[in-house]
């Protein structure tokens, strides 16, 4: 009653909901007055929709009813079938109970049947019993002739007679050992024939990969014999469950022995491939591994294409042979890994084990697909053994790289003392063979490591970069010693400048080679992490190049020293050509420096420009002369301006192509000349202030020396200028490059300034 009430309530709610929805739809249709004309049209349309929905609903309900009707019919049929089966089982049970007594009453008949079968077996074997010696001779002859199938047939007859007699004797009187021994002794030659036949079978199986190509019929005969023996073994084991009797020599398990023979053959074949030793041939391991690769591939291809046709499918001969070869190879690789291998031998072994073995050259060969799945093969060497080999290799490689780098540097050092200039690259830049030798060595080791694994390749690259760091430190020391040796005797080495240029250029080559090496052998993400963990070699290389450039400039300024000392002297005032000689000397040296690669040549040109100007200003501050008149000051200042322009022209020429302004340093000479040239002493403070604002690193002793050079500043004027400048020190701009700070004014000049 409650269910009916709930159902009625639900239907009522549904009706109300439908009415509300209909009202809402009608209200939506009749929102404007002109839509009243279409009321009939709307009514017909809704009627059609209603009829369509009702038709679909009826069809769905009818389909559900048909399904229910079919299900009920099938359940009814199943119930009838269950009743029939139940009745049949009851009938069978009744018949079985009625037959128990009948079976027990036939016991005497059963005993008679057993006795009859024993007598029948004796009669059947009488002929064989009397012909045993003759059959033994025939079987022996057939074995010697290689007629294995016929020999086995004879052997089976002998064994069948012996086993039949012994079985019947066992069933009649299992405790009678004398009769059993008598039968066994009479057939004593049978076991010997079986062993002799087995030897012949094993000999054929040992040469199965050769036999299958020359005489596959013989191999098939061997397999048939083994299969016959397996069937006899199974039959005897089944009979043992009933009688408890097992004939002597059974089970033979020739199938199991066959696989053992094949396993020993595979092991012997793998071990016998080593023809050389390290003493007789340095490439012994490579040859050994290549022979193994060729033999194993050839054997497995033959096994896949020919051998499987000679064996029953359930022998799964190819899969078993593959497992044997894999196991034999694993043992052989472990034996090799345990030897005291050299670095190149470790590489050969690991490359073969980790790559060659699963490659298309061996197990991944198309001729072995799809039977061989390289992804399913177990590793030939355990991860621990591989790790130990890699550790040994890395240790040996570290020692080798250190020795190679040391030898390369020693060879390069010998070249530095040659009387001939170093070689030039395709662009005409001097270079030595050191970078090429070093990175060729790195490249070779990285290529070898890449054959083994990505991880080893990365480790070797890290090792190379680490050793490169140490090597560059030694390279820097040797370059410094080379410079010091030259300074002790500037006539030696003869090509010092050219080889120092080559050393500088080598730094750029090293940089480029390191970048190339990383790009070639590192993935981007690995390179980023390596750069964070490894110190940058750019700093070391730049330091070597900078010291090299400084050494060359030192060479230049040693030749310029005499002429720089002539500046701002009486000789200079009288028309010395010191600046001309300076320009010619610098340009001549820079003709050799043209063989320096651009990044370093650019820095060197800028440094030479700066140092020439500094030395010129140093001469100004040395108070080598003191102008006595305005005319002398004007003449000296104009000469300074001309020489500044001369230097400007020179360094513009040397810096052409660098894209930088080379005028800034020479402007300093012009600015100092303007202070000297000034004719009105009252404006001297203003001019000096302007100079100090441009060059904030100028000190009071510089100003004092400059005023002393003018020769017309009174003591009070000097004091006033100095005190005023000290009250408001100038702040240097961030981009200002100091030029006065390294110019030291002799203390004598400062003392005279205050007099």
Swiss-Prot record:
InterPro entries: EXOC3/Sec6, EXOC3/Sec6_C. It comes from the Eukaryota. Residues 34-62, 618-649 form a coiled coil. The keyword Coiled coil applies. One of its GO terms (cellular component) is perinuclear region of cytoplasm. Pfam families: Sec6 (PF06046). One of its GO terms (molecular function) is SNARE binding. The modification N6-acetyllysine is found at residue 38. Widely expressed, with highest levels in kidney, followed by brain (at protein level). It is found in: Cytoplasm; Cytoplasm, Perinuclear region; Cell projection, Growth cone; Cell projection, Neuron projection. Keywords: Acetylation, Cell projection, Coiled coil, Cytoplasm, Exocytosis, Golgi apparatus, Protein transport, Transport. One of its GO terms (biological process) is protein transport. Signal peptide: none annotated. The keyword Protein transport applies. The exocyst complex is composed of EXOC1, EXOC2, EXOC3, EXOC4, EXOC5, EXOC6, EXOC7 and EXOC8. Interacts with EXOC3L1. Interacts with BIRC6/bruce. Interacts with MYRIP. Interacts with SLC6A9. Component of the exocyst complex involved in the docking of exocytic vesicles with fusion sites on the plasma membrane. Belongs to the SEC6 family. This is Exocyst complex component 3.
């Amino acid at each position: 009653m409650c269910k009916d009430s709930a159902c009625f309530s639900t239907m009522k709610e549904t009706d109300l909901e439908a009415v509300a929805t209909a009202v809402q739809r009608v209200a939506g249709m009749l929102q404007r007055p002109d839509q009243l004309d279409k009321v009939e049209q709307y009514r017909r349309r809704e009627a059609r929709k209603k009829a369509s929905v009702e038709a679909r609903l009826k069809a769905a309900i009818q389909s559900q009813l048909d399904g229910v009707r079919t299900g009920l019919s099938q359940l009814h049929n199943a119930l009838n079938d269950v009743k029939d089966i139940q009745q049949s089982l009851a009938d069978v049970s009744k018949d079985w109970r009625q037959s128990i007594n009948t079976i027990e009453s036939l016991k005497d008949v059963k005993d008679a049947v057993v006795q009859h079968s024993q007598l029948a077996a004796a009669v059947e074997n009488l002929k064989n019993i009397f012909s045993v010696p003759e059959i033994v001779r025939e079987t022996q002859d057939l074995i010697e002739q290689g007629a294995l199938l016929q020999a086995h047939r004879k052997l089976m007859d002998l064994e069948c007679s012996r086993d039949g007699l012994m079985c019947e004797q066992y069933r009649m009187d299992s405790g009678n050992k004398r009769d059993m021994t008598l039968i066994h002794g009479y057939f004593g030659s049978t076991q010997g024939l079986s062993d002799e036949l087995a030897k012949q079978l094993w000999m054929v199986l040992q040469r199965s990969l050769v036999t299958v190509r020359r005489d596959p019929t013989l191999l098939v005969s061997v397999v048939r014999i083994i299969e016959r023996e397996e069937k006899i073994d199974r039959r005897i084991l089944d009979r043992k469950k009933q009688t408890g009797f097992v004939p002597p020599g059974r089970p033979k398990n020739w199938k199991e022995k066959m696989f053992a023979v094949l396993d020993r053959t595979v092991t012997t074949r793998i071990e016998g491939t080593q023809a050389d030793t390290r003493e007789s041939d340095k490439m012994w391991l490579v040859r050994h591994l290549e022979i193994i690769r060729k033999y194993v591939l050839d054997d497995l291809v033959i096994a896949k294409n020919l051998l499987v046709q000679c064996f029953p499918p359930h022998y799964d001969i190819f899969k078993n042979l593959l497992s044997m070869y894999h196991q034999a190879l694993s043992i052989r690789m472990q034996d090799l890994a345990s030897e005291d291998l050299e670095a190149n031998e470790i590489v050969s072994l690991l490359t073969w084990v980790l790559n060659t073995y699963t490659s298309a050259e061996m197990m991944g060969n198309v001729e072995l697909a799809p039977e061989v799945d390289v992804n399913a093969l177990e590793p030939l060497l355990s991860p621990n053994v591989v790790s130990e080999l890699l550790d040994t290799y890395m240790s040996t490689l570290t020692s080798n790289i250190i020795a190679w780098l040391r030898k390369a540097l020693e060879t390069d050092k010998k070249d530095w003392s040659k009387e001939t200039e170093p070689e030039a690259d395709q662009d005409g830049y001097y270079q030595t063979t050191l970078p090429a030798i070093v990175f060729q060595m790195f490249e070779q080791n990285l290529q070898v490591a890449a054959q083994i694994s990505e991880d080893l390749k990365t480790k070797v690259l890290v090792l190379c970069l680490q050793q490169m760091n140490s090597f560059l430190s030694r390279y820097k020391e040797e370059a410094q010693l080379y410079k010091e040796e030259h300074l002790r005797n500037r006539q030696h080495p003869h090509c010092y400048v050219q080889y120092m240029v080559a050393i500088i250029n080598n730094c750029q080559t090293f940089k480029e080679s390191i970048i190339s090496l990383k790009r070639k052998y590192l993935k981007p993400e690995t390179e980023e992490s390596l750069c964070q963990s490894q110190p940058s070699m750019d700093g070391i290389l730049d330091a070597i190049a900078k010291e090299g450039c400084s050494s060359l400039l030192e060479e230049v300024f040693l030749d310029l020293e005499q002429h720089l000392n002539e500046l701002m002297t009486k000789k200079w005032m009288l028309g010395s050509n010191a600046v001309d000689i300076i320009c010619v000397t610098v340009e001549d040296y820079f003709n050799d420096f043209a063989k320096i690669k651009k990044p370093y040549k650019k820095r060197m040109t800028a440094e030479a420009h700066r140092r020439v100007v500094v030395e010129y200003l140093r001469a100004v501050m040395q108070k080598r002369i003191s102008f006595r008149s305005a005319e002398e000051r004007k003449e000296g200042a104009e000469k300074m301006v001309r020489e500044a322009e001369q230097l400007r022209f020179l360094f513009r020429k040397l810096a052409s192509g660098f894209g930088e302004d080379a005028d800034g340093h020479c402007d300093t000479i012009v600015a100092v000349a303007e202070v000297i040239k000034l004719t009105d002493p009252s404006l001297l403070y203003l001019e000096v202030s302007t100079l100090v604002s441009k060059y904030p690193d100028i000190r009071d002793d510089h100003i004092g020396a400059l005023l002393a050079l003018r020769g017309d500043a009174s003591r009070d004027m000097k004091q006033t200028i100095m005190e005023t400048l000290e009250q408001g020190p100038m702040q240097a701009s961030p981009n200002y490059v100091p030029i006065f700070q390294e110019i030291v004014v002799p203390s004598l000049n400062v003392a005279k300034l205050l007099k």
